Regions:
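Beta-propeller domains with acidic blade repeats across secreted/periplasmic ectodomains
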Residues: 17-237
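N-terminal Sec-pathway targeting helices
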Residues: 1-18
């Protein structure tokens, strides 16, 4: 019996080591790896370099280079009215501010934390002097001055969101009607949801009232409105 237990323990240990080595190998060798490895172990790929991006094929007239380094596993990007770039780093719990390229060298002039200590922030957007942040369990907002590149006060809770489960990121956009639209992915692959999940939620910024805008979406990571028609298009993962 003891020999059998030792054998099972040895085999299990070997499998764990092989899995760890496999994940490490994939993280540095395989091109299409990000979402799977990020979900399993929080592993991203190697940092992009000028050489690594030079092999990507682009449409005629486009060029590609590294704009900023050492950001961590960045997720959502949003430009400010001043031309700076806000970046959510979900697993680090922060939002970064990348100062616009004023000197024309093709790089962000500076990178600094704008907000820290957040609960897995993902979606970010700006409207009426507010920076809106979609955490995994809530939408918050904080006053943001694009000219001085500063926030004031502490983030206020606008509305609560269903948290936990497999899809924990929440994508947020301010809609053409001024309401907040938040994608809350399903809690698992095959679920009968008891909370508003696998759905697009509409939130009134002034009151925090939450209604369901669309359902049966699984996990809409990116979405936007078509100019002119106002139709809403989303990409599910």
């Amino acid at each position: 019996m003891r020999k059998a237990l030792k054998f099972i323990g040895a085999v299990t240990g070997a499998l764990v080591v092989l899995l760890a080595l496999g994940l490490w190998y994939l993280s540095s060798r395989v091109t299409v790896r990000g979402p799977v490895l990020h979900a399993i172990a929080g592993i991203g790929g190697a940092e992009a370099t000028t050489d690594s991006v030079s092999g990507l094929r682009l449409a005629p007239g486009f060029t590609l280079d590294v704009y900023a380094r050492n950001l961590g596993p960045a997720r959502v990007l949003r430009f400010t009215p001043a031309g700076d770039l806000l970046v959510s780093v979900t697993r680090a719990g922060k939002v970064l501010l990348l100062e616009r390229d004023a000197d024309g060298d093709g790089r962000a002039d500076a990178v600094r934390p704008l907000l820290e200590g957040l609960d897995r922030p993902h979606g970010i957007d700006l409207a009426d002097g507010w920076l809106y942040i979609a955490e995994t369990g809530a939408v918050r907002r904080v006053r943001f001055d694009a000219t001085t590149r500063t926030v004031s006060g502490t983030p206020q809770r606008v509305a609560s969101l269903p948290g936990g489960g497999m899809h924990f990121t929440r994508t947020l956009r301010v809609g053409p009607d001024g309401a907040l639209y938040v994608a809350a992915g399903s809690s698992c692959n095959v679920c009968i949801e008891t909370t508003p999940r696998a759905a697009m939620l509409r939130i009134e910024p002034a009151t925090g009232a939450v209604t369901s805008h669309a359902e049966g979406l699984r996990n809409t990571v990116g979405f936007d409105w078509q100019p002119g028609s106002g139709d809403l298009y989303g990409v599910d993962n």
